[in-house]
Amino acid sequence: MNQDTICAIATAQGGAIGSIRVSGPEAISITSRIFQPAKAGKLLSEQKPYTLTFGRIYNGEEVIDEVLVSLFRAPHSYTGEDSTEITCHGSSYILQQVMQLLIKNGCRMAQPGEYTQRAFLNGKMDLSQAEAVADLIASSSAATHRLAMSQMRGGFSKELTDLRSKLLNFTSMIELELDFSEEDVEFADRSALRKLADEIEQVISRLVHSFNVGNAIKNGVPVAIIGETNAGKSTLLNVLLNEDKAIVSDIHGTTRDVIEDTINIGGITFRFIDTAGIRETNDTIESLGIERTFQKLDQAEIVLWMVDSSDASSQIKQLSEKIIPRCEEKQLIVVFNKADLIEEMQKEELSALLKNFPKEYTKSIFISAKERRQTDELQKMLINAAHLPTVTQNDIIVTNVRHYEALSKALDAIHRVQDGLDSHISGDFLSQDIRECIFFISDIAGEVTNDMVLQNIFQHFCIGK
């Protein structure tokens, strides 16, 4: 149990209203020392929980501000401790004055994520729910918001609890059998155990495979913009982002390194990657940039191959052997840029250049990035190419790398159990693998997580959370 009382500003600078959170055993008494209710009578410490009290913050006899104080009593608060929230005017001077008074009277400044860490340590939420708080704060689309809300409300935690219950049931049957091994008593039918192992494997496997979707939703669908130099890659990136992110020049090889940025299109976050133009060069730095281009191409889920319409035949012939083999299981959109410089009849001829491309994942479009023609249509194609499901708050989709790694290890363990059952190995070995699986599942919820891991998780939160 935490014996000290913490405080922190919970709102961003520049707003009309500011909020300071105070939590810990002395939260109410420390707040009472600097706060005087406007209505004479009840002191703050005598107020009922979940009440708002209007009054003034004093530094000695000087009034600092007129404020509202919210009161929460343990264990019915966010942290599970006695807590107050002081809502004042948003002046940075006022907020700092109130903070200094709280610290002078016994509070200490909260560490990043300490409020949520205390909520976890006090049993108000498990670790996966605590991590979802950070995801909710960082959410930038409807899908990321829904996934974070689902996890924070305990949807993922319930899935883990059910999974852990099945695993404990499994291992208890195995270990009970081991206790009576000398009496040759079989408590669990091996076919029934195999059926249970299959059920567990299906659940874990579904969660592991959901990470590809979850990671794309959370961090953005990776879209690599590739092509020869001066095909218009940087111009397209600037148009999509609606800002001059990349340098645009007629000089070949201007973009020498990878430029990344994200944008929300139709409720989906896309992570665009503008790459160095592909060409033969003796420039060492440019060569490194081209090498990174192919690395980013391999990592992308959608590839925008920018082709200069006035030189399309040559570019497609030169680069198709390098690009097409790398685009298997990706979505490839061939973007014929500078289409305003060619005749309508030429477009049919250029489209025919793609006749040997794999039709199942290849699309094409004619645009003019400079004139912003057909760029809206390109955005629609990106949405269709993303193939992301419509997400609801009831969906259980893994978005956290730590969870994915733990689930992957749990999946390996349950696979060993399945193989062991098929091979009729001893229950001792089966029990060991099952317990390993339980360990990794429990690690996600924070039931077996060490202090170093906790510190690493919560230090990425903002101070007031």
Curated annotation (Swiss-Prot):
The keyword 4Fe-4S does not apply. GO terms for molecular function: GTP binding; GTPase activity; metal ion binding. (6S)-5-formyl-5,6,7,8-tetrahydrofolate binds at R21, E85, K124, K465. It is found in: Cytoplasm. Its main location: cytoplasm. Homodimer. Heterotetramer of two MnmE and two MnmG subunits. It comes from the Bacteria. Its EC number is 3.6.-.-. It comes from Bacteroides thetaiotaomicron (strain ATCC 29148 / DSM 2079 / JCM 5827 / CCUG 10774 / NCTC 10582 / VPI-5482 / E50). Exhibits a very high intrinsic GTPase hydrolysis rate. Involved in the addition of a carboxymethylaminomethyl (cmnm) group at the wobble position (U34) of certain tRNAs, forming tRNA-cmnm(5)s(2)U34. The keyword Nucleotide-binding applies. K(+) binds at N230, S249, I251, T254. Residues 220-387 form the TrmE-type G domain. PROSITE patterns: G_TRME. Pfam families: MMR_HSR1, MnmE_helical, TrmE_N. This is tRNA modification GTPase MnmE.
